[in-house]
Amino acid sequence: MPQKMQRRDFLRKSTLAALAGTGLKLAPAFAQASPRATVSPNDKVAVGFIGTGRMGQSNLATFMKHPEVEVAAVCDVYGPNLDAAAKIAGEKAKALKDFRQLLEMQEIQAVVVASPDHWHPLHTILACQAGKDVYVEKPVSVYLEEGRRMVEAARRYKRIVQVGTQQRSGLHFQKAVELIRNGTIGKVSFIRTWNYGNSFPEGIGNPPNGDPPQDLDWDLWLGPAPKVPFNPNRFGVHPDRWSSFRWFWNYAGGMMTDWGVHLLDIVQWAMNVEGPSEITAQGGKLYLQDNRETPDTLQVTYQYPGFVCVYENRECNGAQLDGHGYGISFHGSLGTMFLDRAGFQIIPEKTSKGVNLCEPVTEKSSNNHNLAHSRNFLDCLKSRQVPICDIEIGHRSTSVAQLGNIAYRTKSHLLWEPRAEEFRGNQRAGKMLSAKYRKPWRLSV
């Protein structure tokens, strides 16, 4: 029990420390949440689900494992996804095609958002305005300004907003972060993050534009994004593969924001930082001849105070790095830690006489990260305490990935002010921090 309490205290302090730099007084804001949303630990919690594709259905099944959760409604603009979610949710749940109908349901206390990335900001902000707490998938936004508005909405309307970077709820991730912060592998000066895959030879292909399926509201799917003809890859929802909308700039940010956010989130947590000071990127669409817009090969270098972090992705060669197809390697003066969802390993550096400079450690994953992460959200919904991945943290982690994409797209060496969230001396890059919404949609807090 004492060890568990120490770990809990570490997590609380590290989360609050990450938020302290924002200047926000979080505890009072959450303590003043409206009485309607404050529920006792034994009360049922009515939850609505917006976006019921592959990730949305996974979240639905996970939340339903918690005894207090009652699924009040499921919502999707695509009929097959909606029908599948309705079957999982059961007869009591309403099946809706327009998320605004879901937000009008007074009985709903919390909303789980797993819509396409370009919808995350509006779904979250409008849910906060409707008095709902929110669990939103990563990346929180496509544009950095959207993420900042999401933070503002959570604070203004006194909402609990948890971001779905579920690795933060993994016990071995928590221990790994604690070991890094405690100096177990010494001074960390270099970090590598990566995820590799092989989409050879055709990638997502080149389907022509055409008419949307009859059971898809294409205009509502596009929402604030520019109006364009339907293309199967721009929509790209399929239960057996990654949704291909992720490879188009108007809706997402490629692997950089899909996988990179997970990896960079842990880096910033372990190193107790809120953002880099310099960013450079190299890469391109170097092999695949499909109609994706995002690169199939990318390397981004982030300069932080005291260390360098690299993110690497390739979609044309899946060879693993030291047995890891994805992960994080922290390189310290005393040893190296390899960390992924399966566990972590510490490999000591040695003296000239072969003596280990730190203890070798191997630890495997020991809990269900998704279940623990949703549990944390539900507990905070009741207690009004800050969740383990509050929207401020999720926004910061997402923004690092967005900066990598901006460096790649502008071919610039970017100088960044993390606290002010602005570039120094690069107007072109600065224009890529915000989006122009298609009418009638507006980004308004």
Regions flagged by a language model, labelled:
Residues 93-98:
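Conserved SAM-binding strand-loop segment of SAM-dependent methyltransferases
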Residues 1-18:
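N-terminal secretory signal peptides and thylakoid transit peptides that target proteins
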Residues 174-175, 187-445:
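Contiguous beta-strand/loop segments that form the cofactor/metal-binding neighborhood of enzyme cores
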Residues 116, 121-169, 183:
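Beta-strand-loop-alpha-helix segment that lines the small-molecule cofactor/substrate pocket
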